[in-house]
Every structure is written in structure tokens, then in C-alpha cells.
Amino acid sequence: DRETLLQKEKDYTVARQRIELSLESFYRSSSSLVFQLNKRHITRHMSIFRCIDRRFETGEIFIKWDEAADDQWLLLIYIKNNSPDEGIVIEDKTDPEKNSSHDFRANEIFKASDFMVDSLTQLIARERAKKD
């Protein structure tokens, strides 16, 4: 009936908002990181990073090289098992030798941010070393 349908829609909307809100600080952090790295550390001969916000479509945020396809991301951020209570996962493909996955609680944004900074700065260092 109509009442059940409205309740389901309301429940779905509340669940979506919880997911989007729990990823908000991670999006702001990764977006800021990409801006700073592009501004200060990317050389003229390197591609820039892009932070793609898909929180509303797929519940994901990812960082990739500008010219790379979306599925060629470097860092992927999403909610573990689509449940904000279970935490946030950051998958890391910045090192071609070793892909890794790291779990963070929603309140560990600074720890997660440090992790993303380390991964991307090491990637930039490897790219620069290749050019020399």
C-alpha cells in the first residue's frame, strides 16, 4: 500500500544521507589533498590528480590521474558493507607492486588523511624518479 511505500522511501533516504554524511569529511580531505598536490608537487610534465565524487551515485570517492579512465583509480574510498557503523575503507593502488586496503573508523579522518598523503607523495616521488 501507499503508506508502506512512503515509509520505505523515507528509510532509503535516511540511509543514503547517513552514507553521504559519513563520507563528507573524507571527500573534503581528499579534495583538498588533490588540490594541494596539484598546486605544489606536480611538475609541468606530469598529469594532475582528479578527485571524483560519486557519493550520491555509488557511495564512492576516488582519486585518479586526470587522463585515466574512472576504473583506473589510485585511491578508492567507500563505506564498508554500505554500513556507516562498520567504518570507511580506502583501497590503495598507488604502488603497482602492492595493492592494499585499509579500514578506518568514521572519526579517524586525520589518520586516513595522513595515509592518503603518504601514498600519493610516494607515487609522485616514483614518477619523478622515472623521469630523471
Predicted feature descriptions by range:
Residues 43-81:
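Amphipathic, interaction-prone secondary-structure segments
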Residues 1-21:
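Charge-rich, low-complexity alpha-helical coiled-coil segments
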